[in-house]
Amino acid sequence: MKKTGILNSHLAKLADDLGHTDRVCIGDLGLPVPNGIPKIDLSLTSGIPSFQEVLDIYLENILVEKVILAEEIKEANPDQLSRLLAKLDNSVSIEYVSHNHLKQMTQDVKAVIRTGENTPYSNIILQSGVII
């Protein structure tokens, strides 16, 4: 049995299979998942697990070169945004798009990870970097 890192087998496989520029979305309870895109549903109840908890684990285990966020998070959820930005390396590029555009972009991710997060615009697309 694995004792460190990502223990959820679906999340671990997703992280292990990422190549350079592959994208994964971590979303809140309300984010729709396009047909044909795998959904890894971690939600247990409203708020559990939180967006930040899931983001922390992923950032510990994958190299991220870019993140994509909804522009609306700046006004609708500034606390979530400031906590999120504090976790990113200075080398990580940050792109803001409209929430509708972010939802369209989920059509090109490897998977959407659904959290129990119940605050607005708590969605992020992580673009994988490369270690060489």
Curated annotation (Swiss-Prot):
Q: Which residues bind substrate?
A: D28, H99, Y121, S122, N123
Q: Which SUPFAM superfamilies match?
A: RbsD-like
Q: Quote the EC number.
A: 5.4.99.62
Q: Which domain of life is it from?
A: Bacteria
Question: Which residues carry out catalysis?
Answer: H20
Q: Name one Pfam family in it.
A: RbsD_FucU
Q: Where in the cell is it found?
A: Cytoplasm
Protein task: Catalyzes the interconversion of beta-pyran and beta-furan forms of D-ribose.
Q: What is the designated name of this protein?
A: D-ribose pyranase
Species of origin: Streptococcus agalactiae serotype V (strain ATCC BAA-611 / 2603 V/R)
The uppermost taxa in this organism's lineage are:
Bacteria, Bacillati, Bacillota, Bacilli, Lactobacillales
Provide the gene name from the record.
rbsD
